[in-house]
Amino acid sequence: MTKALFFVAGIAVGLCTSLFAAQGAGSIAVLNTSGVYIELVTLVPGEGSGQHSTIPGEVGIVAEGEVVLSSPAGRESLQAGKAYWLPGLTPHDIRNESNRLAKVYVIAMKRCD
């Protein structure tokens, strides 16, 4: 089973970096500006992000299929058209437990002071 690792970081001193390293179905950066990073993440059945957190808050919108979001608040099943919000540094895992392909738009606001 492959896993994807999500990492979005803001670096103090006014520089911002965003990085998504994926093994498996993959991802595509849809928008990467100085203020926001949007990525379309594709998860094959059984694939997940692995437990991770992002420095800024994270918004996810399920575009296709179904995923399970696990966080300290519990487990939540999200179907296409549903969204989630996680405050910065919240540990979480996004997993495709279905037998269909799942696609999620992941949005992180960059903070460069």
Where are these regions (language model features)?
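Bacterial N-terminal signal peptides
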Residues: 8-18
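Ligand-binding loop in jelly-roll beta-barrel domains
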Residues: 89-113
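A short glycine-rich, His/Asp/Glu-containing loop-to-beta-strand
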Residues: 23-50, 107-110
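Glycine- and acidic-residue-biased ligand/ion/polar-headgroup-sensing regions
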Residues: 55-72
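Bacterial N-terminal signal peptides that target proteins for export
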Residues: 1-8
